[in-house]
Amino acid sequence: MHPAAEHSPLGKSSEYISTYTPSLLFPIPRAAKWAELGLSAETLPYKGVDFWNCFELSWLLPSGKPVVAIGEFSIPADSPNIIESKSFKLYLNSLNQTAFADTASLEATLRTDLSAAAGKPVTVRIRTLAESEAEGVMALPGVCIDDLDISVSNYEHPRPELLRCDDARVVEESVHSHLLKSNCPVTSQPDWGSVVVEYRGHALDHASLLEYIVSFRQHSDFHEQCVERIFLDLQRLLKPEKLTVYARYVRRGGLDINPYRSTEDVAFQNVRLARQ
């Protein structure tokens, strides 16, 4: 467990506050998890962002009438901190009985508070339900590898030694799997996700990639670090000209987290999947 997470509200009984309380946000430094992967803020081999979607966003108009919407938050992958998810939920709940002059005022407040917690500017977008309905759900790009016939016996920790590639072939392709699962490092609750790998490099053996993804099944870590670990393991193996790894996790507590890591500039369409 990340030492800072021990002091967060995650896994503890919490009082739900319904009036605006920005102090509820609990930042967790990324540095310790980066260090586990041999990284530092100065040596990150990727660009990226963590997209959060909130489906339980509500506040009051000056008249006292409630509003509901969907919040979309984009936190830079190189920000000093992540925001602990339960504290994020509690903070958003604190808006429920708080009046804002208009949506722009709420967005400005969210931007200020979340940027302060993350340590870098956070992008905020508030979508109406009609806008979300119009966007619908998306299918992941590329080939789904989930129907490949594999044998698995170890689920306790990620196993990069399972990954194989053909050094004699260079390809450019997109593949994805819906079989990503890990566990929350604090509560041990399951985190269900789908993951996409897009790259140009030595041809990746798809069955070995699926075996590797399944090896995360009992692994305990935050969403962001799981994606960073996958990125680094594939980068070492494939020596790619370009590489993108991103995951879309099933929501918990009204929030879903979607980490995106890439050697390229961020080109990400934040549209939910069927399980989100």
UniProtKB/Swiss-Prot annotation:
Known EC number: 1.7.1.13
GO CC annotations on file: cytoplasm
Binding site for NADPH: 85-86, 252-253
Matches recorded under InterPro entries: GTP-CH-I_C/QueF (IPR043133), NADPH_dep_7-cyano-7-deazaG_red (IPR050084), QueF (IPR029500), QueF_N (IPR029139), QueF_type2 (IPR016428)
Metabolic or biological pathway: tRNA modification; tRNA-queuosine biosynthesis
GO biological process: queuosine biosynthetic process; tRNA modification
Active-site residues, as the UniProt record annotates them: 184, 191
Keywords recorded for this protein, A-Z: Cytoplasm, NADP, Oxidoreductase, Queuosine biosynthesis
Protein's UniProt keywords contain Chloroplast: no
Localization: Cytoplasm
Positions of substrate binding: 83-85, 223-224
Keyword presence, NADP: yes
Domain of life where this protein originates: Bacteria
Top EC category: oxidoreductase
Reactions the enzyme catalyzes: 7-aminomethyl-7-carbaguanine + 2 NADP(+) = 7-cyano-7-deazaguanine + 2 NADPH + 3 H(+)
Known function: Catalyzes the NADPH-dependent reduction of 7-cyano-7-deazaguanine (preQ0) to 7-aminomethyl-7-deazaguanine (preQ1).
Family label: Belongs to the GTP cyclohydrolase I family. QueF type 2 subfamily.
Subunit structure, as described in the record: Homodimer.
Protein name as it appears in the record: NADPH-dependent 7-cyano-7-deazaguanine reductase
Species of origin: Pseudomonas fluorescens (strain SBW25)
Lineage: Bacteria, Pseudomonadati, Pseudomonadota, Gammaproteobacteria, Pseudomonadales
